[in-house]
Amino acid sequence: MDISRSKFFRLASAALLAGWCTTVWAQGTITLHGASQFNDEHPFTKGLMKFEELVKKYYGKPVNFVLHKNSELGLEKDYFAYMNQGISVDYAIVSPAHMSTFAKAAPFIDAPFVFRDHDQMNKVIAQGVLNPIADEIAKKADVLLLGYGGGGVRSIFATKAFSDMAGIKNLKIRVQGAPIWTRTFKAAGMAPTVIAYSEVYNGIQTGVIEAGENEAAGVEQMKFYEVGPNLMQTRHAISIRPICFSGKTLRRLPADLQAAIRKAAAEAGDWERQLESSSDTSILDKLQKEGKLKLVPFNERDKMRESMMPVLSEYAKEIGAEAIFAKINAIK
């Protein structure tokens, strides 16, 4: 499909939605629009549906939700831009990588080896360690991080199998757009490149790249196993995916609905995180049993971590995230 034409129709649809939402509110019927890149089976979509369910429960009055799935309104970076502008998308789950324009420290909380395990990550969230980043994003982007989903463990999938650091040398791998991902993967000896998430499949198929990295749910949903049938269990990152809400939208809503949204988002984030973290192994085992994916133990994970940690520490200094990184490391 012609990319410019596709983008035109997507933006046109978003513009129409923005006008329609305003009209509905003016008539007194509140309708909120959400967006997900994935279908009903993905944990992100399920998390947003849980959010909607909880809002209705806590608000106790009529409120309508329209959740646009399967990238109908673009990708996560588009959702964040729409929420920043107060149009088209009121709520979505978005990768911190797409928030770096407004807060340099945002992608750091989703970087490789920042969290030791799920227990540490859950404590970081519960203790409010990430609040300074959320506050900066709210101030500069007017997008509120009201809950924290994620919990998926990211590993490398590729056209070839390997089990040690020698195998990843010069590996042409797609990484997320935040600079910390390029720097850490280069430090480990790989050849990272940034391309759109929606182009990863074609990128491997055409030989532009030979690998990517993702959580189990993403590998299954995007069918990356078809082009990268070997999944090396590097377990190099645990994802954090905030449930975001447009500040411009929230301020236009009744106070009791605002309170319900805040409470529901926090609970839905915890719920989605548990769902995603608990389904990782079962998804990968299922794909392997079906002959779609080969799980390959990675024997030098500690060496990979050691190669990346100096870059993480230096980057934390550059972006003013030293205090946050220190607090994360202090949590056992």
Placement of each model-derived feature along the sequence:
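N-terminal secretory/targeting leader peptides
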Residues: 2-3, 9-13, 18, 27-121, ...
